[in-house]
Amino acid sequence: LEIIRSCDLIVLPAVSKEECYAYRIVGQVCPEISDMPLLCTPFPMIKDEKKLELAHTRIYETIEDYLRRGQIVGMLTIGDPGIYSTYLYMHKRAKENGWQAEIINGVPSFCAVAAKLGISLGEKKEEIHIIPAAYEVEDTFSYSGTCVYMKSGKIGRASCRERV
C-alpha cells in the first residue's frame, strides 16, 4: 500500500475505475486511491499479434509520457503480475527503454482458492501445470498432477474426470 500511495499516477487496465476489479479491491484497503490521478486504459484481449503489439505500444507511449515528466507511475493488476498479466507488457517496454520498473508480487487466484479450500495444489513429486486456456487445451487434459486453467472464460465447459 505504501507504494500505491507514493505514486503520482495509477494505471488501471480497464475502461473505467468502476470496471476495474483491481481498483475495487485496492479501494477496500486504501480508500484514498479514489482521490489519486488515474489513467484508465483497456488492454485488448485478442490473439492478433500485430493488433496486440500496436495496442501495447500505444498504451506504453501514453504511460511513458508521464514517466518523462518525472512522475511515479504504478499499475494495478489482479493476481500476480508474473502470471499472464497485462502489467508485464508494460514492464518489459519500460525496462527496454531504460526506466526503473519493479514487479510487486501478488497472490494468484488459484493459490487463493486452494488456500480458501484448505487444499494443496501439489505435494512431493506432483506436477502443477498452469495453462493459458484461451488457446487450445485439449492436449492438456491428459497431464498428470494439477492443471490450472487461466483466462478460461472462453473455453466453455471442459470434460472433467476423476483420476485414481
Residue ranges of model-derived segments:
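Structural signal for conserved beta-strand scaffold positions within catalytic alpha/beta enzyme cores
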Residues: 12, 37-42, 103, 123, ...
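Short beta->alpha connector loops
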Residues: 16-17, 134-136, 151-155
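Flexible, charged surface loops at secondary-structure boundaries
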Residues: 2-6, 68-69, 124, 140-144
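Class I SAM-dependent methyltransferase SAM-binding "motif I" and its flanking Rossmann-like core
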Residues: 79-143
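Generic beta-sheet signal
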Residues: 71-75, 101, 145-150
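Short, surface-exposed amphipathic charged segments that create phosphate/polyanion-binding patches used
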Residues: 51-60, 116-119, 142-146
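Class I S-adenosyl-L-methionine
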Residues: 3-97
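A contiguous loop/helix-start segment that scaffolds small-molecule binding in enzyme catalytic cores
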Residues: 140-163
